[in-house]
Amino acid sequence: MTQNDLMSELKQQALVDINEAKDAQALQEVKVKYLGKKGSVSGLMKNMKDLPNEDKPAYGQKVNELRQTIQSELDERQKLIKEEKLNQQLSEETIDVTLPSRHIEIGSKHPLTRTVEEIEDLFLGLGYEIVDGYEVEQDYYNFEALNLPKSHPARDMQDSFYITEEILMRTHTSPVQARTMEKRKGQGPVKIICPGKVYRRDSDDATHSHQFTQIEGLVVDKDIKMSDLKGTLELVAKKLFGADREIRLRPSYFPFTEPSVEVDVSCFKCKGQGCNVCKHTGWIEILGAGMVHPNVLEMAGFDSKEYSGFAFGMGPDRIAMLKYGIEDIRHFYTNDVRFLDQFKAVEDRGEQ
């Protein structure tokens, strides 16, 4: 039998084996049988050493053509096997299009989002502007521009996440106020609220979190008085907690305001009679506020003899906890669907 006859017979046998392969594994075995290192086609190349030199190029070309033919047939058969497998799956996994579709879960706004939007809508109605700022902030705007120089003892009041010596995660949204006043270049009025996330090195527990939400407000203009602040806070308390709420101002200390006050609202659960929510005092602390310190105005470019202002800061987390009777602040951040589903029902009823 000549070499040509041997190649022709080998080709025919390879085509038969390829067509008889029913799956990918069988096809791989055929490939190894003919094209593997110890396969039949590779064996033909070993015979080349016995041929005269003038016959070797033609012989090598024919062996390569045989290899290419077998490889091409293998590729076609592999494609056909994949198609057959897919068609079989489709026939076995038929879908009854008349069956009802899967129930699609409809989400709702997060309770913190609802509370923040409620507060934003309230202040937009009062003519305030909403201003965003940087969460990664410069030490200057977070502290020094707010009357807290590097040597000020009040810096110990809030441990901070420092990235470098001069860059940190903001500990409050007050830097937005400082930057906004600086941009206005001493020209009033300024009437803004600054919502956003803030960061402090607190150990997480039922009432503390290393990350929480804060909304601060600022009004700067000529002839702004403490009575303007009190009237604003009374309106906010009634809108958030009920029309029959009263507020109480207690003297306090914040480096960036003077005078400074803590603001309490009469308990909406016991109507001031005393209960677990208000710790039997009849009052619930909701925010801090005060008249903008003259040093803060001056550092931002405002003449403190011509301009005055008030500022306040509130925590939507705490307000949401009070409004919805939530005992642990960590529930807001654990993404527990059982917890969040409760507020979908509130939203469906159109309640605030």
From Swiss-Prot:
Keywords: Aminoacyl-tRNA synthetase, ATP-binding, Cytoplasm, Ligase, Magnesium, Metal-binding, Nucleotide-binding, Protein biosynthesis. GO terms for molecular function: ATP binding; catalytic activity, acting on a protein; magnesium ion binding; phenylalanine-tRNA ligase activity; transferase activity; tRNA binding. GO terms for biological process: phenylalanyl-tRNA aminoacylation. This is Phenylalanine--tRNA ligase alpha subunit. Pfam families: Phe_tRNA-synt_N, tRNA-synt_2d. It comes from Staphylococcus epidermidis (strain ATCC 12228 / FDA PCI 1200). SUPFAM superfamilies: Class II aaRS and biotin synthetases, tRNA-binding arm. The gene is pheS. Binds 2 magnesium ions per tetramer. GO terms for cellular component: cytoplasm. Its EC number is 6.1.1.20. Its cofactor is Mg(2+). The keyword Nucleus does not apply. InterPro entries: aa-tRNA-synth_II, aa-tRNA-synth_II/BPL/LPL, Phe-tRNA-synth_IIc_asu, Phe-tRNA_ligase_II_N, Phe_tRNA_ligase_alpha1_bac, Phenylalanyl-tRNA_Synthase, tRNA-bd_arm. CDD domains: PheRS_alpha_core (cd00496). Mg(2+) binds at residue 258. It catalyses: tRNA(Phe) + L-phenylalanine + ATP = L-phenylalanyl-tRNA(Phe) + AMP + diphosphate + H(+). Tetramer of two alpha and two beta subunits. Belongs to the class-II aminoacyl-tRNA synthetase family. Phe-tRNA synthetase alpha subunit type 1 subfamily. It is found in: Cytoplasm.
